[in-house]
Amino acid sequence: MKSIYFVAGLFVMLVQGSWQHPLQDTEEKPRSFSTSQTDLLDDPDQMNEDKRHSQGTFTSDYSKFLDTRRAQDFLDWLKNTKRNRNEIAKRHDEFERHAEGTFTSDVSSYLEGQAAKEFIAWLVKGRGRRDFPEEVTIVEELRRRHADGSFSDEMNTVLDHLATKDFINWLIQTKITDRK
């Protein structure tokens, strides 16, 4: 009698095991999609298994898409900051690397801007040198020796100075369209 119960229990376990699809089987060998849609509707376990598999595939593909999208957005941001070079981008860049290996900082950029402003102011004033008044400049140029040993001529110095002033005045007074 015990053997009949044992055989019946074993038979019930086999039937119950055939109804359930273990997770290991579905992961190791993918199910073929040659079954028709009517077969899938008939077997609810099959529908749950395929649904779980498709959700996992979708989640995996979606996370890969999000990763590539984030990487693409980061590259676009980098390109825009390099292209625009606006104040926000300069604030984040401590140094800008040049091909010859030198670095320029925000301080040197500021100093270059200041030097440009001083040069424009110097052009507007029309002076020969930035640091010295006109009289001192003329005296220094008279005392300076050329490479061949002769002294600079006072007349040439004065004419050069006047020509420079006339040129700067012409630049300031004429419009850009008139210069062409």
Curated annotation (Swiss-Prot):
Q: What is its main location?
A: secreted
Biological processes annotated in GO: adenylate cyclase-modulating G protein-coupled receptor signaling pathway; glucose homeostasis; negative regulation of apoptotic process; positive regulation of insulin secretion involved in cellular response to glucose stimulus; protein kinase A signaling; regulation of insulin secretion; response to activity
Signal peptide per UniProt: 1-20
| A Pfam family reported for this protein in Swiss-Prot or TrEMBL | Hormone_2
InterPro entries noted in UniProt: Glucagon, Glucagon_GIP_secretin_VIP
User: Which keywords label this protein?
Assistant: Amidation, Cleavage on pair of basic residues, Hormone, Phosphoprotein, Secreted, Signal
Its domain of life reads Eukaryota
Which positions carry Phosphoserine? 54, 105, 108, 150, 152
Q: Where is this region: Disordered?
A: 23-56
What residues does the record give for site: Cleavage?
52-53, 83-84, 91-92, 97-98, 130-131, 145-146
Where, per UniProt, does this protein localize? Secreted
Q: Which residues are the propeptide, according to the record? A: 84-89, 131-145
Task: Give the family, as the similarity comment puts it.
Answer: Belongs to the glucagon family.
- Its name, as the record gives it, is Pro-glucagon
* Taxonomic lineage from the root: Eukaryota, Metazoa, Chordata, Craniata, Vertebrata
What gene does the UniProt entry assign to this protein? GCG
